[in-house]
UniProtKB/Swiss-Prot annotation:
Component of the mitochondrial small ribosomal subunit (mt-SSU). Mature N.crassa 74S mitochondrial ribosomes consist of a small (37S) and a large (54S) subunit. The 37S small subunit contains a 16S ribosomal RNA (16S mt-rRNA) and 32 different proteins. The 54S large subunit contains a 23S rRNA (23S mt-rRNA) and 42 different proteins. CDD domains: Ribosomal_S15p_S13e. Keywords: Mitochondrion, Ribonucleoprotein, Ribosomal protein. The keyword Mitochondrion applies. InterPro entries: Ribosomal_uS15 (IPR000589), Ribosomal_uS15_bac-type (IPR005290), uS15_NS1_RNA-bd_sf (IPR009068). Component of the mitochondrial ribosome (mitoribosome), a dedicated translation machinery responsible for the synthesis of mitochondrial genome-encoded proteins, including at least some of the essential transmembrane subunits of the mitochondrial respiratory chain. The mitoribosomes are attached to the mitochondrial inner membrane and translation products are cotranslationally integrated into the membrane. This is Small ribosomal subunit protein uS15m. Belongs to the universal ribosomal protein uS15 family. Residues 37-60, 214-242 are annotated as: Disordered.
Length: 320
C-alpha cells in the first residue's frame, strides 16, 4: 500500500498568478514633460523667500509683454487689411473722382472733430460724359463762332443799333448756354457710374506706362547679369492694359463696393459681397503676377505707395 503524502486542500492556498505581469517602463525611457507655469503655491513660496527678486522678475515680464504687444501691433499695421489696405490720399480721392481738394472732416458720435481734413490729389480737367476741359472749351468756342450774328456786307444800308442789339442778345444767350453746359458736364452732379469712368481715366493717367516710363527714375526691373537690354517698340497710344493700371481700376471698384456694403442693409447684400470677393481675388492674382515680374522696379514701388497696398492684399488667403 503506497504511503500517503500530505498536500494542499484545494486551490485556496495557491498564490500563483496565471496572468503575465505587465512590466512597468523604465524611468529613463519615459518622456520628460516640462511645464512653463508654476503653481500658485510655488509662486507664493518664492515670493515669500525673495520678494525683491520676485518684484524684479515681474517687472521684466511686464516690460517684455508690453514690447511684444507693440511689435504685434506694428506687424498688424504693416500687414494691413486684405480689402482696403492702407487708405492713401489718392485712394480717398476716388470718392469724389478727383474733384474735391480736401477730404471730408471726420466727426465722432458726440459731434467733436476727430480728424482734420487732408489735402487730396485732384483732376480738375475731367468732365462728365467722358469729356475733358480742352474738348469742352473748344466745343463752346466753336458753338459761339457759328452762332454769332453776321454783320451786313453793305455797310451803307446796315443798321448799327440793330447789330449791337443782336450782339448783346447773342452774348446773353451764350453765357446762359455756357452756364447750363457747365452744370450738365460737372462731375459733382453725376452718379456712381460717371465717377467710375472718371476714376478709370485717372488710373490710366497716373499708372499708365506711357507716363511712368518718362517720370519714374527706374521704371523697369533690373536685368540679370549678362543680359543685354532690348530696344522696345514705340508705344502707339495710352497704356490701358498693364498690370498696375488694372490693379488701380480694381482698387477703385473695391473701395466703392466696400463702402456700399458698410452702409445700411449691406450685411444682407449677398450678391455684392460675392462680387467684392471676386474683385479682391482678381486683384490678388494680378499682384502676385506683378510681384514676380516687376519686383524691385519703380512701377512696383510707385503702385504700392500710391494705392496703399499691403502684403495682406496678395499674400495668404483672403476670406470675406
Amino acid at each position: 500500500m503506497p504511503p500517503r503524502l500530505p498536500g494542499p486542500q484545494g486551490l485556496r492556498s495557491l498564490t500563483l498568478c496565471l496572468r503575465p505581469a505587465v512590466a512597468s517602463p523604465a524611468q529613463a525611457l519615459q518622456p520628460l514633460i516640462q511645464t512653463a507655469n508654476i503653481s500658485q503655491k510655488e509662486k507664493k513660496r518664492k515670493m515669500k523667500q525673495d520678494p525683491y527678486g520676485w518684484a524684479q522678475a515681474q517687472q521684466r515680464k511686464a516690460v517684455n509683454v508690453k514690447r511684444q504687444a507693440e511689435l504685434q501691433a506694428q506687424r498688424d499695421a504693416a500687414w494691413g487689411d486684405p480689402v482696403k489696405g492702407i487708405t492713401t490720399p489718392f485712394v480717398e480721392s476716388f470718392d469724389s473722382a478727383g474733384q474735391a481738394s480736401v477730404s471730408p472732416p471726420k466727426v465722432g458720435p458726440d459731434g467733436q472733430l476727430v480728424e482734420e481734413p487732408k489735402p487730396l490729389p485732384t483732376s480738375p480737367h475731367l468732365r462728365n460724359y467722358l469729356l475733358n476741359k480742352d474738348e469742352f472749351d473748344s466745343a463752346i468756342q466753336y458753338a459761339e463762332h457759328i452762332l454769332k450774328p453776321i454783320k451786313a456786307e453793305d455797310r451803307l444800308t446796315a443798321d448799327p443799333e440793330k447789330e449791337d442789339e443782336e450782339a448783346r442778345e447773342h452774348a446773353a444767350r451764350h453765357a446762359k448756354a455756357v452756364a447750363a453746359l457747365e452744370r450738365i458736364a460737372k462731375l459733382e452732379h453725376g452718379g456712381a457710374k460717371d465717377r467710375k469712368h472718371a476714376n478709370i481715366r485717372r488710373c490710366i493717367e497716373t499708372f499708365g506706362r506711357h507716363i511712368t516710363d518718362q517720370s519714374l527714375e527706374r521704371p523697369t526691373p533690373p536685368l540679370a547679369r549678362g543680359v543685354e537690354p532690348k530696344p522696345q517698340p514705340v508705344r502707339a497710344g495710352p497704356d490701358t492694359g498693364s498690370s498696375e493700371v488694372q490693379i488701380a481700376i480694381l482698387t477703385s471698384k473695391i473701395r466703392a463696393l466696400s463702402k456700399a456694403l458698410e452702409g445700411h442693409g449691406g450685411n444682407r447684400d449677398k450678391n455684392n459681397k460675392r462680387s467684392l470677393r471676386r474683385l479682391c481675388h482678381k486683384r490678388q492674382r494680378l499682384l502676385r503676377y506683378m510681384e514676380r515680374k516687376e519686383r524691385g522696379s519703380g512701377r512696383w514701388h510707385h503702385m504700392l505707395e500710391t494705392l496703399g497696398l499691403t502684403p495682406a492684399t496678395w499674400k495668404g488667403q483672403i476670406t470675406l
